[in-house]
Amino acid sequence: MLSRLSRRCYCTSSVHRPWLFLGLGNPGDKYKGTRHNIGFEMIDVFAESVGIQMNLVNFKAIMGQGFVADLPVILAKPQTYMNLSGESSGPLAAYYKLPLNRVLVVHDDMQLPCGVLRLQEKGGHGCHNGLKSVMNHFRGNREFARLRIGIGKPPGQMDPKAFLLQKFSMPARERMDKALAEGVDALKLVLAKDFGESWRLFNVEQKYKHLKQHTILSA
């Protein structure tokens, strides 16, 4: 059963400000397992791996609060539907008085091959309506991090909207499950290291992984 968010504010620590990891997706069983909901999946997998229960509800989001290696972390899955994600993320970040350099958004990305991840310090919305809403509620500010999860491009002339709301094929699901495990490592890296060489090396490894997979499939 979900409980209300406690008034406890992790921002009282003068040593560590909390990180907010925000996964984008659509609420309801209808959308579970679809490409557009991989942000939700990443938050759930990470929460389970670090022992944070997603049993809080506030700011139009299902949430969890806890610590990872003594670092405060807030996890959230907006329940507003994708295109209105900012209605949750904006008030949530404001409540905790979080600077945007302590916010990371996890989202699907059609510009990356299926199962390939990329950490990004900041950037635009790339025509992703969920990101667009988040940015609008951050007053147009784009200075927040992202974990982009590649879902590949729709085949042929397939409508991108239909592609996003479709579930993964079995081979794609296997790649995505491996990617989610790697995503846990990526989020732990974010907590341990500021943007810099370690993030760049992670992205290089992800690019090499894709090239290696492509070579095997082409052989």
UniProtKB/Swiss-Prot annotation:
Chief subcellular location: mitochondrion
Q: Which UniProt keywords apply?
A: Hydrolase, Mitochondrion, mRNA processing, mRNA splicing, Ribonucleoprotein, RNA-binding, Transit peptide, tRNA-binding
Residues bound to tRNA are Y31, Y81, N83, N129
Q: Where is this site: Stabilizes the basic form of H active site to accept a proton?
A: D108
A Gene Ontology annotation in the biological process aspect, one of them, is: RNA splicing
What does the record give as EC number? 3.1.1.29
- Can you say what this protein is called? Peptidyl-tRNA hydrolase, mitochondrial
Organism encoding this protein? Arabidopsis thaliana (Mouse-ear cress)
